[in-house]
């Protein structure tokens, strides 16, 4: 499966409004949904350097700042209005998935974390 297929099938297909996969090493964009431009790749990779990193800065994705509600070396979750963002680091990439009011925060986290587990289990 291509990286774009993970975005299209596993994230957008599960109800996320927009999503991207970034390289964990440098924050480069590997795949993204149409019109979703994640220019903050380096800043997103920095969120996973130490527990709590996102609490000081918030989570900046596609020009929006999300208030951090979880931040550790694997996952960073943020809220903005009725929606939010879930970022999860695997061995090689970072899942960045934005949801709106059509997807509950717990469901959003569960979907992204399960995809991350699958990728990790497959050495990705």
From Swiss-Prot:
User: What name goes with this protein?
Assistant: Profilin-2
The record's function comment reads:
Binds to actin and affects the structure of the cytoskeleton. At high concentrations, profilin prevents the polymerization of actin, whereas it enhances it at low concentrations. By binding to PIP2, it inhibits the formation of IP3 and DG.
GO-annotated cellular components: actin cytoskeleton; cell cortex; extracellular matrix
The record ties this protein, via InterPro entries, to:
PFN, PFN_euk, PFN_sf, Profilin_CS
GO MF term (any one): actin monomer binding
Q: Which organism is it from?
A: Dictyostelium discoideum (Social amoeba)
Domain of life the protein comes from: Eukaryota
Q: What binding partners and quaternary form does the record give?
A: Occurs in many kinds of cells as a complex with monomeric actin in a 1:1 ratio. Interacts with forH.
Q: Does the keyword Amino-acid biosynthesis apply?
A: no
Q: Which UniProt keywords apply?
A: Actin-binding, Cytoplasm, Cytoskeleton
Family (UniProt): Belongs to the profilin family.
Note the SS bond partners: none
Q: Where is the protein found, in the record's own terms?
A: Cytoplasm, Cytoskeleton
* GO terms for biological process, alphabetical: actin nucleation; cell motility; exocytosis; hyperosmotic response; mitotic cytokinesis; negative regulation of actin filament polymerization; negative regulation of phagocytosis; pinocytosis
